[in-house]
Amino acid sequence: GDLIERLKLEGENTPADIFMTVDAGDLWYAGTQDIFQSVITDTIQSNIPIHLRDPEGLWTGLSVRARTIVYSTDRVDPSELSTYSDLATQKWKGKLCLRTSKKIYTKSLVASIIHNQGQEKATEIVSGWVDNLAAVPNAKDSHIMDAILAGQCDVGLVNTYYFGRLIEETPDAPLKLFWANQDTTGVHVNVSGAGVTKHASNAADAIKLLEWLSSAKAQAIYGSLNKEYPANQNISYDEIVSAWGSFKQDKMNLAIAGKLQADAVKLMQRLDYK
């Protein structure tokens, strides 16, 4: 938010050629504030799948994080797990840990549920989540995993790279990922991404940088550093990430997560999701 406001204030005098951020909701919002210029090139279109970039070319995803279920291998049989909506059912009462509704990742996930299942069903799901909470929502995904390890809850929802970092440090931690919604919409994914600023003084070079960032070489670096999935799906994954297996992604265009963000916030406020 602060950087977007700064770019708006700087206008034509901005020194920034590229704006980069960590969530499609933020990228979409930046697009509504008229700080990007449209960049549609054959290189970016061939490297990055259509659902991971703005339909008008304002921004493109550069790395992918899936937001899925993490569970205690000591207390949960994976056959009990299935979907995001299943976590709203009675069997998870007092066993669920979630991240606060104030965080952009939560807003984007709920926005995707509104898009895929409608406002009424989304309300039912989020209401069930709130009823099933074992504790006040956490500030960070790492805190959710800490709470599961401490026995405070049995299941949670996290971005995959947080799990990757934990497993890198503690390979024998009794936690596993479960890919949600594999028989329906697929796992909700989000991106970190970037776009060329409207008043970029080095626009041609900025476009070249964006193209390079979408390339196999850059994507391999990007993914391995943060335990994320490459947005360019023509390259192999980091070793830790590969160990989690393949999964079906939700192919909703991520600009929709931005458009429905305000609806997601209102829904969560109405249900007192902290």
Residue ranges and their predicted role:
Residues G1-W28, K274:
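Early extracytoplasmic/lumenal segment of secretory-pathway proteins
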Residues T14-F19, Q37-I69, S85, K95-L98:
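A structural signal for short loop-to-beta-strand junctions that line the ligand-binding cleft
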Residues A30-S38, I50-G57, L166-A180:
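Ligand-binding "clamshell"
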Residues I48-I50, V64-R65, G94-K102, V126-V130, P137-N138, W212-S236, ...:
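Periplasmic-binding protein-like
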Residues T68-R75, V189-N202, I221-S224:
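A bilobed periplasmic-binding-protein/Venus flytrap-type ligand-binding module shared by bacterial periplasmic
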Residues S101, Y105, S112-A180:
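Ligand-binding pocket segment of bilobal, Venus flytrap-like solute-binding proteins
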Residues E120, E228-K274:
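An extracytoplasmic/periplasmic, membrane-proximal ligand-sensing/linker region
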